Amino acid sequence: MLMTKSGDSKNTLYCSFCGKSQHEVRKLIAGPTVFICDECVELCMDIIREENKTHLVKSRDGVPTPKEICKVLDDYVIGQAHAKKVLSVAVHNHYKRLAHGQKNNDIEIGKSNIMLIGPTGSGKTLLAQTLARILDVPFTMADATTLTEAGYVGEDVENIILKLLQAADYNVERAQRGIVYIDEVDKISRKSDNPSITRDVSGEGVQQALLKIMEGTVASVPPQGGRKHPQQEFLQVDTTNILFICGGAFAGLEKIIGSRGKGGGIGYGAEVRDPDERRTGEILREVEPEDLLRFGLIPEFIGRLPVVATLEDLDEAALIEILTKPKNALVKQYGRLFEMEGVSLSFTDDALKSVANRAIARKTGARGLRSILEGILLGTMYDLPGMENVEEVVINGEVAEGRAAPLMTYGPEERAEESA
């Protein structure tokens, strides 16, 4: 039985869990001699979701198997089967190494950091975020383009470790088992193959600065962030067991790989295969360390990232799946927003195809889907809170292409007023 709000103070009902009255909440659900409000229901659902998430990744020795990791990744990330397989094995081996590190001291297993290579919007960041969430370890992201060598204007490399420490609530032990994702590493490539008298503080200099923390060192982290001050007490964080995942689009890398495959060089005399013959993702899968070296990464930096996972371009079918299939799919997110207004939202197949094709045309991959949906739904989301008796909003192909207004279904009262 659903109890709605009443103005009669003598018969006021209260939530049996939080004690709020029916006037302070949206809904009260009645049970045998007890009531529970909508806020407590949401809280209970959050607790259950967290417990289910933790249960999914448990295995015999406490380290999730690659298949378990991949299975959970499938719930959130569409496609990229090869990249998910590579990541699952690498992450499993990393945390198995930590779990059994003290048992076998005769052989020391090295750390395998990961390089993610793929076009913009193919899911590099989402894969790293999802891995950290399902493993319940601290996670932080850094943009390589904002980093500079120590002593120059910009962000210190140590600030990455500070962010990880903050994500771990300043628990040093937890932070030392966390995951760091460094995005846009292709933007810190060496500006030229030839040595220069001018110092490259935001390119090769950043690669040099990252070497130590990626390999394993004790970083002195100022608790307040920013540049170091002599008066500050530093926190000591050992980065040996922190997993570093570096990602980048590496635009133009496929041409370097293609020229190697054809035996040619780079320049006017190079014979490069037409990029339309094969998709970029297929070419990137053939990447070798020498290709990354020619792109502008220094040998030491490449050596710190032994595991390389390449991601494919997303086609129309994959983008439509991304819109609808994952647990936190965009269509479901906007559907929930409309539910808060008491309205259901639906997209026709041709509308989804239109959205996917616009993202492909923009070359933004999955990252561009939200902005496209925002543009389509902006007018509706602006008007809807002030409208009455709207039951359903339907987005079809014409609406998605901006040639028509969204289709709205009204409740009985509105129909009665129209007929009158």
Curated annotation (Swiss-Prot):
Zn(2+) binds at residues 15, 18, 37, 40. One of its GO terms (molecular function) is ATP-dependent protein folding chaperone. Keywords: ATP-binding, Chaperone, Metal-binding, Nucleotide-binding, Zinc. ATP binds at residues 119-126. GO terms for biological process: cell division; proteolysis involved in protein catabolic process. Pfam families: AAA_2, ClpB_D2-small, zf-C4_ClpX. Belongs to the ClpX chaperone family. PANTHER family: ATP-DEPENDENT CLP PROTEASE ATP-BINDING SUBUNIT CLPX-LIKE, MITOCHONDRIAL, ATP-DEPENDENT CLP PROTEASE ATP-BINDING SUBUNIT CLPX-LIKE, MITOCHONDRIAL-RELATED. This is ATP-dependent Clp protease ATP-binding subunit ClpX. The gene is clpX.
